[in-house]
């Protein structure tokens, strides 16, 4: 079984507070692993650390088969890992929906024609082709979450890291998010405190409490 992410005894301290205290987990290909715990348990820190966006003080991280400690280690791998932020406003940067979804491919050097068609396909995938020319600031919270997800899917990632993917969503949008994620068949690490994510999305779950992961 291929291991996509392995975190071994990872410790993270932020503002003199221990957030992760020897956290250990492994995400295997084909899994949708949920990390659940209360607000402030360190779930977001776990995801950011797994992608090298926060430094860790001790332990080890292996991402997509590569040992990762420094920015130089993580940077070449980020194009294969999609991170969905808890707040889509932290993720959306384009003036229009289509331009936002095109941004990632264009940033990787795709030609404009290829990026445009890939973005169209991603918007079809999340059910929002009719919003392609809509200014991002006019979207509802649920629409922003779906556009942010389209921006990840267009990059054809190997794995998704999802930070509270259903928080503050109505049941209709939550259902749509689940349908899209399940249809993608991607491996996922999901930080959540939503029981629906555990019941309907996760294939396995662990608990994060006081910086420690338990089964």
What is the meaning of each model-derived region?
Residues 160-163:
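Catalytic Walker B motif of ABC-type/P-loop ATPase nucleotide-binding domains
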Residues 192-193:
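H-loop/switch region of ABC-family ATPase nucleotide-binding domains
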Residues 36-38:
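The feature captures the beta-strand-to-loop junction immediately N-terminal to the Walker
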């Amino acid at each position: 079984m291929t291991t996509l992410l392995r975190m071994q005894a990872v410790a993270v301290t932020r503002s003199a507070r221990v957030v992760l205290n020897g956290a250990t987990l492994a995400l295997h290909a084909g899994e949708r692993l949920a990390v659940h715990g209360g607000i402030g348990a360190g779930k977001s820190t776990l995801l950011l650390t797994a992608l090298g966006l926060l430094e860790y003080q001790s332990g080890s991280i292996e991402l997509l088969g590569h040992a990762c400690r420094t920015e130089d280690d993580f940077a070449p791998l980020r194009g294969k890992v999609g991170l969905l932020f808890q707040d889509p406003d932290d993720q959306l940067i384009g003036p229009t929906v289509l331009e936002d979804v095109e941004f990632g491919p264009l940033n990787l050097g795709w030609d404009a024609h290829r990026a445009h068609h890939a973005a169209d396909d991603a918007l079809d995938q999340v059910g929002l082709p009719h919003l392609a020319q809509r200014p991002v600031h006019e979207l509802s919270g649920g629409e922003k979450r779906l556009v942010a997800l389209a921006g990840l899917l267009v990059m054809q990632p190997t794995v998704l890291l999802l930070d509270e993917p259903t928080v503050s969503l109505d049941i209709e949008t939550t259902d749509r998010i689940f349908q899209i994620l399940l249809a993608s068949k991607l491996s996922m690490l999901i930080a959540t405190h939503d029981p629906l994510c555990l019941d309907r999305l996760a294939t396995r779950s662990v608990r994060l409490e006081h910086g420690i992961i338990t089964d």
